[in-house]
Amino acid sequence: MSEAPAPVVTFKKGPSRRPAQSRQRRRSPSPLDPVAEASASASGSNVVRPERKSLANPLVQGTKRRRTNANNEEEEDGVGGGLDEFDYAAEGGLTRKGDELATRANDWDLEDVDGQGQRDKKVRLDEDGEIVTDDGLYRGASAYLPTINKTRETLDKKMKSGPIKATSHVRTITLMDYQPDVCKDYKETGFCGYGDSCKFLHDRGDYLAGWQLDKLPEEGVREVEEEDEEEEVPFACLICRQPFTQPVVTKCGHYFCMGCAAKRFQKSPKCYACGAPTQGIFNIADKVIAKIEARNKARREAREERAEQTGGGGIEIGGGSDEEGSDEE
């Protein structure tokens, strides 16, 4: 016998059941359909919403009121103007000329005025300028009064403390006078350990600032002595920064005074300029001595020339006393 096929089970989805009293949303009528709007107004009642009262709050700003007013005016006039336009302009009384701000001033240190008032309360003077005695109450160490009577201006200057009051003028004129970067060692001694790699200027001339040039007289400018630039020989000791006294030279070629070199050798056997070992050998500096003698000779000759010029055309005082005495006799 042949077996019968098994029955196929089929599943069928049943209809969805909805409660009979379910609330359905009414279709909103189109604004272009006046018939539907009329039927809706006749069949049902409209929702009335309460109007919100606008409170005057300065922190809340908007353009709704201006837009509403503009639309109302547009409907009345028939011309669209949009939102109101405002023109902002500064007050005419604030305009000033350029020259008026040149001497503009302001009180920057207002705290100083209060401090002055507190000092006036502490130190009180009568009509004669005498300090008014205290009433006997103890008010702390800060309330002590000076025992020596002084004037009001002196008391104000002595008792004032703190930073200096800033200028009250807004516009100031400042002059900046910069000092040139001149090598101090080369200017004072004629020698610099850095040599050509020194970042400062190697010049022995005198540089004056602007305020120093203003103090110089117009006449009688000192003559600048010409120096021999071919031979770089120092003119002052590197240790004492004074003109040489008994100049000596080391093996490394640096010049010092005899006394300065001896004191330096007692502390350290190395050279003061370059740090090389000197081994206690100091030779006589013939070049420096010759340069000093040439300079002294030039000064003597210049002094003699000046004496001859002043002596030849000068006025002799009491030169004719002998002749007058002989004539009287």
From Swiss-Prot:
Q: Does the keyword Zinc apply?
A: yes
Compartment(s): Nucleus
Q: Which CDD domains match?
A: RING-HC_RNF113A_B
Stretches of Gly residues bias are at 310-320
Predominant cellular place of this UniProt entry's protein: nucleus
Q: Where is this region: Disordered?
A: 1-86, 298-329
User: Which PROSITE patterns does the UniProt entry name for this protein?
Assistant: ZF_C3H1, ZF_RING_1, ZF_RING_2
Residue spans, zinc finger RING-type: 237-275
The biased composition feature labelled Acidic residues covers 72-86
Question: Single Gene Ontology BP term?
Answer: snoRNA splicing
One annotated Gene Ontology cellular component of this protein: U2-type spliceosomal complex
Keyword annotations: DNA-binding, Metal-binding, mRNA processing, mRNA splicing, Nucleus, Spliceosome, Zinc, Zinc-finger
> How is the quaternary structure described?
Associated with the spliceosome.
What is the designated name of this protein? Pre-mRNA-splicing factor CWC24
**What is the protein's species of origin?**
Cryptococcus neoformans var. neoformans serotype D (strain JEC21 / ATCC MYA-565)
